[in-house]
Every structure is written in structure tokens, then in C-alpha cells.
Amino acid sequence: MVATNRCCVFALLVALLLIHSLAEAGKGKEVLGKIKNKLVEVKEKIKAGWDKLTSKSEYACPVIDKFCEDHCAAKNAIGKCDDFKCQCLNS
């Protein structure tokens, strides 16, 4: 008898959760849309920050220099960052 009552209570809770989920589905689309818009804004801010950073050679060259050194080391060459372009010089 007790198990039957617990089962009914559980079924009732599941039904209420299902109804609530269906009712909130429309609102969920709005929330997901807002989240997507915020993520797009964050992506654009990060991209703008990176572009600003790389436009200043004194800040960007160390980052590019390290990439260039690693890239050229794989080719058994010496990497040199020149005007934001990686040049592999034969050693």
C-alpha cells in the first residue's frame, strides 16, 4: 500500500514537471536567444581586443615570435618575426 502511494506521488511529480517544462519551452527559446546574443557580443569583443593587440608590434611580436620560432623549428630553420610575418631562415 505504501509503495503504491509513493509511486502515485512520483508519477504526479513527473507529470507536473513535464507540464511545467512544456509551459516554459517558449520562454526557454527566449533565454537561449539572449545567451546566444551575449556569446556573439563576447566573441566580437575578444576579436576586437586581439586585433587591437596585434596592431601594436611591441605587444604582438612576442606572441607571433614564439609561434614563428616553433613553426620554423619543425622545419629545421630559424624563425624571425618581421612586420607580423613569419619568415623561416635556413640555418
Curated annotation (Swiss-Prot):
<dbReference type="InterPro" id="IPR029237">
    <property type="entry name" value="Long_scorpion_toxin_alpha/beta"/>
</dbReference>
<keyword id="KW-0872">Ion channel impairing toxin</keyword>
<keyword id="KW-0632">Potassium channel impairing toxin</keyword>
<keyword id="KW-0964">Secreted</keyword>
<dbReference type="GO" id="GO:0042742">
    <property type="term" value="P:defense response to bacterium"/>
</dbReference>
<protein>
    <recommendedName>
        <fullName>Potassium channel toxin TdiKIK</fullName>
    </recommendedName>
</protein>
<dbReference type="GO" id="GO:0015459">
    <property type="term" value="F:potassium channel regulator activity"/>
</dbReference>
<feature type="disulfide bond">
    <location>
        <begin position="68"/>
        <end position="86"/>
    </location>
</feature>
<keyword id="KW-0528">Neurotoxin</keyword>
<comment type="similarity">
    <text>Belongs to the long chain scorpion toxin family. Class 2 subfamily.</text>
</comment>
<keyword id="KW-0800">Toxin</keyword>
<dbReference type="Pfam" id="PF14866">
    <property type="entry name" value="Scorpion_toxin_alpha-beta"/>
</dbReference>
<keyword id="KW-0732">Signal</keyword>
<feature type="propeptide">
    <location>
        <begin position="26"/>
        <end position="44"/>
    </location>
</feature>
<dbReference type="GO" id="GO:0005576">
    <property type="term" value="C:extracellular region"/>
</dbReference>
<comment type="function">
    <text>The full peptide presents antibacterial and cytotoxic activities. The synthetic C-terminus (AA 33-76) inhibits voltage-gated potassium channels Kv1.1/KCNA1, Kv1.2/KCNA2, and Kv1.3/KCNA3.</text>
</comment>
<keyword id="KW-1015">Disulfide bond</keyword>
<feature type="domain" description="BetaSPN-type CS-alpha/beta">
    <location>
        <begin position="58"/>
        <end position="91"/>
    </location>
</feature>
<feature type="disulfide bond">
    <location>
        <begin position="72"/>
        <end position="88"/>
    </location>
</feature>
<feature type="signal peptide">
    <location>
        <begin position="1"/>
        <end position="25"/>
    </location>
</feature>
<dbReference type="GO" id="GO:0090729">
    <property type="term" value="F:toxin activity"/>
</dbReference>
<feature type="disulfide bond">
    <location>
        <begin position="61"/>
        <end position="81"/>
    </location>
</feature>
<keyword id="KW-0929">Antimicrobial</keyword>
<keyword id="KW-0044">Antibiotic</keyword>
